């Protein structure tokens, strides 16, 4: 037996004796026997992964510390969308570094997500108040992506009858790069200037622009309104605390980055972007929206609203492919605003503006020409032929400024800037600081109050803030409390040793456009990670840029698109997608300019190879790609996977491998060896980056050698086709995956995969006598997850899958994936991190629920008044003076003979009214004046 370092044993849940007992329950003598039965021999990797030997936690932390110590952290005045911040320690400690917040899943199950839903609701309120627009989503991926998404909203608003987009001012270069990437496959015409014509869908107004200047856009906005074009503001949210809200001057949408609300730069991310829109655009915007509804007893409750817009329902007709966004960072931004309150935010903004104004005045007094008269935090100076020399002098003093071109530099102030910085920077230009007024746009200062809601005024002491964040966290069920057995989500351990480096100064506080010689630690860490991921997947190249799995899909499909174009095959636009695919697949294909053709699945869940062959041959002249998830979304290793790939290749297409289920492959098989040309990897699933309650995520792509030239580029690297604002996307959290792989080693990673497969098969074995297990492969085995058919309870007792999901809350569990990929079923993925004790507890709960359903079927409990129909049960409901139900209070909240009371979770609300919440959409808290 292989001996593992302590970390491997601590990451994997079952002990040696548990593993033996589980294998015995399956009637198997060894783990190898199980893997032989579950994984087709034709795809097995018959060698060890060539990765560095595993290190202990202490040694891995020391090695990474040495690597990241090569970074030189200097004070950044580069700006361009990234700013130094003071993250309040009360937020860093109690939210950012708290597993109760970062290990939670996207809040689809409202009743166990009220804490983070409430804070996201406050985030939306914050954005609505800053922008003056009534509807905001609960974050997007970054500012550049948000601009592209807003343009998509404008085109949908015009029913795709208008395709021209006017960039009315100077946006950040990375934003233009991402917009251009998005525009090409969708046929958008990107123009600059001030000419609005009848084909213009929207104008994009930077507020301020990349030079820091507030331009005069009154005429172009008026022209846009006259022509029916929408107005998109790209607005700095700190500036909006003292500047007029964009809605006041005609914006229909506003987007931007919330990074400077307490979120470190992190060499580019992760950060939450915002999007706010007018009410008329509500139903066509991307991303999650948190809405307010009521529960079964009339109590206010939060939920995800208007989900029919989203990819998991609308597929290729969705408003976007956005799935995971940036919930954790949005919650940090909301907490930052709650901590400081409106007066505190304005004080920060006013101080920043004053520093910039005094710097501008000093330069002008010294005869230096600056761009514009109206500014907030940035001064752009003309220094003919001296830009590099001035930047070098600033660097010597420990400060980085932006070189725009050989004759122009930019200096951006933020909340970390000091009087000493002002003096030192002015001296570079032969100037001395002078007194000066804060220069704003005349008539554009914020006149009205904002953030009058009580929550933004009630948490000024650290004691109050600490308890506020604790109360919210206690409302939720995250991995720190119980197993989250969501199928296709891989909710595994996010080990403390993996998470610790994210807060290091050498990780958190670097600007993504810092000089290359100062970020050698990041260069080494990302190079290691790219090489390791290539070895794990078999690919020739990897891009770490995509900052979500959905963006990885998009980047991979765009690589395929550009490859076909380079070979004179740009007409290839057909993407074959199985009917069982994740909803992001067809949504991403549409964004990449492809037309989706659905491939049927057989009754046993496998792809219908005859249908695939027929459709590949039918579209052979235009076939671009085939998207496949493996193991399948039904939790099975399909024996015909290599044949599927051969059919597609024989007909001129490329194979896109959805890596959502890579946790069943690592160390056992490699996508490239199977026949894939490109694959995205969800680092927030297989490789231990936490889900954060709905983000951040990271979705790098691996590609075969012929696709390497078509990986995403970046304007800072002198290349094109960026899919995210920063070259390495959410760079700071890549250290989590680096640590995971470094501590596991190749053998440990393989062992984790085996344990995940064992846990899933053990669950299937324990439950199959009570619930049908819908799909199995050869030898009656599943992969790393299984579909449990709860429709038998519907047939016998009228108990729905939702009833089962809500009842599991009373047993102390987050429900498995509900009604996906098969309606009326639950898909369970235990991951390798769950111990046998917890797995047995889940199985016991599922079996007990079947017993409760039998009581309904037998007439012991009425169909409309039983523990399942009324689940979940809150403490207040259970302690009510009157108890009129035919079951006892104990049966309600301490169910099942084997229930462990120490695992009890009390939901803060009972079942939430989803329909009512969508019919009466409330997605921000009204200001105090609204109650007068």
UniProtKB/Swiss-Prot annotation:
Keyword Oxidoreductase appears in the UniProt entry: yes
Tree of life domain: Bacteria
Enzyme class: oxidoreductase
Keywords for this protein: Oxidoreductase, Pyridoxal phosphate
Cofactor: pyridoxal 5'-phosphate
Name this polypeptide is given: Glycine dehydrogenase (decarboxylating)
InterPro entries: GcvP, GDC-P_C, GDC-P_N, GDC_P, PyrdxlP-dep_Trfase, PyrdxlP-dep_Trfase_major, PyrdxlP-dep_Trfase_small
GO MF terms, alphabetically ordered: glycine binding; glycine dehydrogenase (decarboxylating) activity; pyridoxal phosphate binding
CDD domains: GDC-P
Residues annotated with N6-(pyridoxal phosphate)lysine modification: 685
């Amino acid at each position: 037996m292989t001996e593992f370092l302590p970390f491997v044993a601590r990451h994997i849940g079952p002990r040696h004796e548990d593993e033996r007992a589980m294998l015995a329950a399956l009637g198997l003598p060894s783990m190898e026997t199980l893997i032989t039965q579950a994984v087709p021999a034709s795809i097995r990797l018959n060698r060890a992964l060539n990765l560095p030997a595993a290190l202990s936690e202490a040694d891995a932390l020391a090695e990474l510390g040495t690597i990241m110590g090569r970074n030189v952290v200097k004070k950044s005045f580069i700006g361009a969308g990234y700013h130094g911040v003071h993250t309040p320690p009360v937020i860093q400690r109690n939210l950012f570094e708290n597993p109760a917040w970062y290990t939670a899943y996207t809040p689809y199950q409202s009743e166990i997500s009220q804490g983070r839903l409430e804070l996201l609701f406050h985030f939306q309120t914050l954005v609505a108040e800053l922008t003056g627009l009534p509807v905001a989503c609960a974050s997007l991926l970054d500012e550049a992506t948000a601009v592209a998404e807003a343009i998509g909203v404008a085109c949908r608003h015009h029913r795709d009858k208008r395709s021209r987009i006017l960039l009315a001012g100077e946006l950040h270069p990375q934003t233009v790069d991402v917009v251009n990437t998005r525009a090409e496959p969708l046929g958008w015409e990107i123009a600059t200037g001030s000419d609005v014509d009848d084909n213009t869908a929207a104008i994009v107004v930077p507020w301020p622009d990349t030079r820091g200047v507030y331009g005069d856009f009154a005429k172009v906005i008026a022209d846009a309104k006259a022509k029916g074009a929408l107005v998109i503001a790209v607005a700095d949210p700190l500036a909006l605390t003292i500047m007029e809200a964009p809605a006041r001057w005609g914006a229909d949408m506003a987007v931007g980055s919330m990074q400077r609300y307490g979120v470190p730069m992190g060499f580019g991310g992760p950060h939450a972007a915002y999007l706010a829109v007018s009410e008329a655009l509500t139903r066509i915007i991307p991303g999650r929206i948190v809405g307010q509804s009521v529960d079964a007893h009339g109590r206010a409750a939060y939920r995800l609203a208007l989900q029919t817009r989203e990819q998991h329902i609308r597929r290729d007709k969705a408003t976007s492919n956005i799935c995971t966004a940036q919930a954790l960072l949005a919650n940090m931004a909301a907490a930052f605003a709650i901590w400081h309150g409106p007066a505190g935010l304005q004080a920060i903004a006013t101080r920043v503006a004053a520093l910039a104004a005094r710097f501008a005045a000093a330069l002008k007094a010294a005869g230096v020409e600056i761009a514009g008269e109206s500014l907030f935090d940035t001064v752009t100076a003309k220094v003919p032929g001296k830009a590099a020399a001035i930047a070098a002098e600033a660097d010597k003093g420990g400060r980085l400024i932006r070189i725009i071109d050989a004759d122009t530099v930019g200096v951006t102030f933020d909340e970390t800037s000091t009087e000493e910085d002002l003096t030192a920077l002015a001296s570079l230009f032969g100037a001395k600081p002078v007194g000066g007024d804060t220069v704003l746009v005349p008539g554009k200062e914020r006149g009205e109050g904002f953030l009058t809601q009580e929550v933004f005024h009630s948490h000024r002491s650290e004691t109050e803030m600490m308890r506020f964040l604790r109360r919210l966290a206690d409302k939720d069920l995250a991995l720190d409390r119980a197993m989250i057995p969501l199928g296709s989500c891989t909710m595994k351990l996010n080990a403390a040793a993996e998470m610790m480096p994210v807060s290091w100064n050498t990780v958190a506080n670097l600007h993504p456009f810092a000089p290359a010689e100062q970020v050698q630690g990041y260069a080494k860490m990302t190079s290691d990670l790219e090489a390791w991921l290539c070895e794990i997947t078999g690919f020739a190249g990897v891009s770490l840029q995509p900052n979500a799995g959905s963006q990885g899909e998009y980047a991979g499909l765009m690589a395929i698109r550009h490859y076909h174009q380079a070979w004179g095959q740009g007409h290839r636009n057909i993407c074959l997608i199985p009917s069982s695919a994740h909803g992001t697949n067809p949504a991403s294909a549409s964004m990449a300019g492809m037309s989706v053709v659905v491939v049927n699945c057989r009754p046993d869940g496998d792809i219908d190879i005859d249908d695939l062959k027929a459709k590949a041959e039918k579209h052979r002249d235009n076939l671009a790609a085939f998207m496949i998830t493996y193991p399948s979304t039904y939790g099975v290793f399909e024996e015909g996977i290599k044949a599927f790939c051969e059919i597609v290749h024989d007909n001129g297409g490329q194979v896109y491998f959805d890596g959502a289920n890579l946790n069943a492959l690592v160390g056992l098989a490699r996508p490239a060896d199977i026949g894939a040309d490109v694959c995205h990897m969800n680092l927030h699933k297989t490789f231990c980056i936490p889900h954060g309650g709905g983000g951040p995520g990271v979705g790098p792509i691996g590609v075969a050698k012929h696709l390497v030239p078509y990986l995403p580029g970046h304007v800072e690297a002198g290349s094109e086709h960026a899919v995210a604002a920063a070259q390495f996307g959410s760079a700071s959290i890549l250290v989590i995956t680096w640590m995971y792989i470094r501590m596991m080693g190749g053998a440990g990673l393989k062992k984790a995969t085996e344990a995940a497969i064992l846990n899933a098969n053990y669950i299937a074995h324990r439950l199959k006598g009570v619930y049908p297990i819908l799909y199995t492969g050869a030898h009656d085995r599943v992969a790393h997850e299984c579909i449990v058919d709860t429709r038998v309870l519907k047939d016998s007792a009228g108990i729905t899958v939702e009833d089962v999901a809500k009842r599991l809350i009373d047993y102390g569990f987050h429900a498995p994936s509900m009604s996906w990929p098969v309606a009326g079923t639950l898909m369970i993925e235990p991951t390798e991190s769950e111990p046998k004790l917890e797995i047995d507890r889940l199985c016991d709960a599922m079996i007990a629920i079947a017993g409760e359903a039998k009581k309904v079927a037998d007439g012991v409990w009425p169909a409309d008044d039983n523990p399942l129909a009324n689940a979940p049960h809150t403490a207040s409901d259970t302690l009510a003076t009157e108890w009129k139900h035919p079951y006892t209070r104990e049966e309600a909240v301490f169910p099942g003979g084997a229930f462990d009371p120490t695992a009890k979770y009390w939901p803060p609300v009972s079942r939430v009214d989803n329909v009512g919440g969508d019919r009466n959409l409330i997605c921000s808290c009204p200001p105090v004046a609204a109650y007068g």
